[in-house]
Amino acid sequence: MTAACWTSEELDQIGSADELRIAPVRGGRTVGRSVPIWVVRVGENLYIRSWRGASGAWFRAARASRAAHVCAGGVERDVEVLDAEERASDAVDAAYRQKYGRYPTYVEPMVSPVARATTLRLIPRPPHAQRA
């Protein structure tokens, strides 16, 4: 599939939102229950992590299907869910600390090796590929 790009407006809106709601696709095309998670922007990319590590239910479902529906900052999009490249990890850690540093009890687990291993990149699906 050819991925679309986030618009500057989408990046700004999602990147500045405190939470993103993610609903992983389950069983092919059924969108599951949405859950609130943290999201960070690094350059032109959006990243998410599982606070519970690889055992998080939303993480397992999103990683298995590689697809989800997200909503944050007034933006709703169907997305591809890809494993982030290891080289992005330090920048993603820094983005979590900068954005969520006011929650030190929660941000430290988000930059731990357990959560870091669950870093996913969100790629918007082209409009013609959006769910019907």
List PLM regions with ranges.
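Short, P/G- and charge-enriched loop/turn segments at secondary-structure junctions
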Residues: 8-10, 25-26, 106-109
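Short secondary-structure boundary/capping segments
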Residues: 11-12, 38, 110-112
